[in-house]
């Protein structure tokens, strides 16, 4: 299975609304996300920046949270999305 990352911010309201969707997806499927808080963790910020050339074009030209990233296919899903969209994205990987 592909390695899926979730970049999020501790105080980000969009990230907070996505967490139950992520948890539901992990409970209902074999999908697992490696979660990285980037607002207060410099190592996680560096990790996210290391993918900036791939993430920025897919995320409106900027690095933002929440962002979901597949390290194998280099596909990204950016922002707050409905559960079904997250599920479809994660399972197609």
Segments from the language model and where they lie:
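Extreme N-terminal starter segment of soluble prokaryotic enzymes
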Residues: 1-5
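Structural micro-motif
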Residues: 52-69
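Typically the conserved alpha-helix immediately C-terminal to a functionally engaged Cys/Sec
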Residues: 16-30
């Amino acid at each position: 299975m592909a390695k899926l990352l979730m970049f999020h911010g501790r105080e980000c309201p969009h990230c907070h609304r996505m967490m139950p969707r992520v948890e539901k997806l992990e409970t209902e499927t074999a999908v697992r996300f490696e979660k990285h808080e980037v607002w207060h963790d410099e190592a996680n910020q560096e990790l996210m920046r290391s993918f900036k050339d791939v993430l920025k074009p897919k995320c409106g030209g900027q690095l933002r949270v929440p962002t979901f990233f597949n390290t194998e296919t280099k596909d990204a899903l950016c922002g707050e999305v409905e559960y079904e969209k997250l599920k479809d994205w994660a399972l197609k990987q």
